[in-house]
């Protein structure tokens, strides 16, 4: 006769005993959902790490000192995915754990080994980026190939020392039947819990924040110098253009005045000469009526000459108006140049700082930043350092935030659960879905590392795109020519392609 269970208990199918609802194992649906999500995370992590590792191995020039650390990070992630994750997926099935407690202890130690190796490598990368930016001249002598390999070996030695205490009795691991996974009994050894949390989160996070804070300050100062130099060069160019436009305007004005004076003198001289010639010809005509006729001819000739003179003056006036118009346009352009000089349009690039592999690359791109015309002249003409545009600070802060926040997101909940287990019974107080989410986030770091430390780097990103194109996009076979006997003809100049050989379409259609 099976025991009857109350509302606060439920019968366990395996042991046929009544268990509190707070200690019941996860349901089959819960286990399936956990396993499916884990498989998706592990698949993406495996693909991302393999592609990035292939790119680094394919291009030897990319395997510099820093990229060796990144390659070591990929190795730790791949080992975590290949050796640890399959057992975590299998234990997500309720009432299924085929091995004994000793294997569970070994599995927890192996999980911590790869996790500590990954954390130590991230710390080394942060220090390496600090030395690269702050001490660029002495960096090659400080970070030699020999020292880089010593650091790589040191990450694994330190990880081994940090993860193996449960194997020789300091700290205990067991299989959690309620949450269906192997875990440490953190409350049984508070000292090991404190050491693990400090090694996992406190020290690495402190080193990362310190290094990237100094790197951000140095990058901001260098960008300010670049920004100031660009603004000074732009002001000099604007002043030169204004002076040049003023000189051209004065030159055109002088030419216009000289041309008007010359045209006025030339028109008056021609009128006097032609009038005197008409007076000399008039006495040769008969006296009396002939004189009258000559007088009329004189008036007529004078009228004609006056008409010509007025036409020339009119033409000269029209040319003068054109010159005046050009001069006014040049003056307006010069005034615009003065306004631009006061406004000082400076461009500061959005991609000035690029933290690929936590590295800073300064480009010469610029994004418009306008000093308002309503600002006081003392500010517009000030020689002090111009303020950095907010887009630059947001860009740098955003990238550093991605690096640090992803680290805290993946390992922070796991460390918080370890600390909480010292004072609280997590088997009964922490919901099972919270434990599942913490497991997902712990393995999510294997997906994040290839993106943060690989894809964000410009050169590595380009190589990854080329590799993906070769894997995904198949090359289409070349289209064979349907008229193999046709020859190329020289295109004439009328076609606008002089000197190039192009297939003749007319030869294909002609009989």
UniProtKB/Swiss-Prot annotation:
Annotated membrane topology is: Multi-pass membrane protein
- Cellular localization per UniProt: Cell membrane
Q: Which cysteines are joined by disulfide bonds?
A: 104-182
Q: Which residues lie on this side of the membrane: Cytoplasmic?
A: 57-67, 128-149, 218-398, 454-511
One term under GO cellular component: receptor complex
Give the principal location in a single coarse category.
membrane
Q: Which UniProt keywords apply?
A: Cell membrane, Disulfide bond, G-protein coupled receptor, Glycoprotein, Membrane, Receptor, Transducer, Transmembrane, Transmembrane helix
According to its UniProt entry, what is the function of this protein? Orphan receptor.
- Write out the similarity annotation: Belongs to the G-protein coupled receptor 1 family.
What's the protein name?
Probable G-protein coupled receptor 101
Q: Which organism is it from?
A: Mus musculus (Mouse)
Q: Gene name?
A: Gpr101
């Amino acid at each position: 006769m099976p025991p009857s269970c109350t509302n606060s208990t439920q019968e366990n199918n395996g042991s046929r005993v009544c268990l509190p609802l707070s200690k019941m194992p996860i349901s089959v649906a819960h286990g399936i959902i956990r396993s499916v999500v884990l498989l998706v995370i592990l698949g993406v992590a495996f693909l991302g790490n393999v592609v990035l590792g292939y790119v680094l191995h394919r291009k030897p020039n990319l395997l510099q000192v820093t990229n060796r650390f990144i390659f070591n990070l990929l190795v730790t992630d791949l080992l975590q995915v290949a050796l640890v994750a399959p057992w975590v997926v299998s234990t997500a099935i309720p009432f299924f754990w085929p091995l004994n407690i000793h294997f569970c202890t070994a599995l927890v130690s192996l999980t911590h080994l790869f996790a500590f190796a990954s954390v130590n490598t991230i710390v080394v990368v942060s220090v390496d980026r600090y030395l690269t930016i702050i001490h660029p001249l002495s960096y090659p002598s400080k970070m030699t190939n020999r020292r880089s390999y010593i650091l790589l070996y040191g990450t694994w030695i330190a990880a081994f020392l940090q993860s193996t205490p449960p194997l020789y009795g300091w700290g205990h691991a067991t299989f959690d039947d309620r949450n269906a996974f192997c875990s440490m009994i953190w409350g049984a050894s508070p000292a090991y819990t404190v050491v693990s949390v400090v090694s996992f989160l406190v020290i690495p996070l402190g080193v990362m924040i310190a290094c990237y804070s100094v790197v951000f300050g140095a990058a901001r100062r260098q960008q300010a110098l670049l920004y100031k130099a660009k603004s000074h060069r732009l002001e000099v160019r604007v002043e030169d253009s204004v002076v040049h436009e003023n000189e051209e305007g004065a030159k055109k004005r002088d030419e216009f005045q000289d041309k008007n004076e010359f045209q006025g003198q030339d028109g008056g001289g021609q009128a006097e000469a032609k009038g005197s010639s008409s007076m000399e010809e008039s006495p040769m005509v008969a006296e009396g009526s002939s004189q009258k006729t000559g007088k009329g001819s004189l008036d007529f000739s004078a009228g004609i000459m006056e008409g010509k003179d007025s036409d020339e003056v009119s033409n000269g006036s029209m040319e003068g108006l054109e010159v005046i118009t050009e001069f006014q346009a040049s003056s307006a352009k010069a005034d615009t140049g003065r306004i631009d000089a006061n406004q000082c349009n400076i461009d500061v690039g959005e991609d000035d700082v690029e933290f690929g592999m936590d590295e800073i690359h300064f480009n010469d791109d610029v994004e418009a930043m306008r000093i308002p015309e309503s600002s006081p002249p003392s500010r517009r003409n000030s020689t002090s350092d111009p303020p950095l545009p907010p887009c630059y600070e947001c860009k740098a802060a955003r990238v550093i935030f991605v690096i640090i926040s992803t680290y805290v997101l993946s390992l922070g909940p796991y460390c918080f659960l370890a600390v909480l287990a010292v004072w609280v019974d997590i088997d009964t107080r922490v919901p099972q879905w919270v434990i599942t989410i913490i497991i997902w986030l712990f393995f999510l770091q294997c997906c994040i590392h290839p993106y943060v430390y690989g894809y964000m780097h410009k050169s590595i990103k380009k190589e990854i795109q080329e590799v993906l194109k070769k894997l995904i996009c198949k090359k289409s076979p070349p289209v064979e020519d349907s008229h193999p006997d046709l020859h190329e003809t020289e295109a004439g100049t009328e076609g606008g392609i002089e000197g190039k050989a192009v297939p003749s379409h007319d030869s294909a259609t002609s009989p």
